[in-house]
Amino acid sequence: KMQQGVETDELELLKAGVIQNFEFTYELCWKFMKRWIETNISSEIVDGVTRRELFRLSAENRLIIDFDEWMEYHWARNISLHTYNSEIAEEVYQITLKFIKAAQDFLGRLEMRND
């Protein structure tokens, strides 16, 4: 039983690390979206925009594929900052598993556009 408890603690610690990396990477992604739009479209268009509007602009400019998915990441980021309970942590963890592919896709689109 003690071994199982240690494994559970290690798994929870691993998930917490994944969530922390998600939070950091999510922040970088939206900031790069904003910077790309400021540089390539207009700096005025992104002044004071909400994340919803930023993701809409990013989708319109083909930086991201799925607007709704990015709104889900935004929700997960917000909830991970303000709440900690195991059910919400598990939900955020599951969302981060989808986020990895979306973040990689976004990076690829940025790289193609910046050559």
What does each model-identified segment do?
Residues 1-115:
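Solvent-exposed interaction patches of small proteins and small membrane subunits
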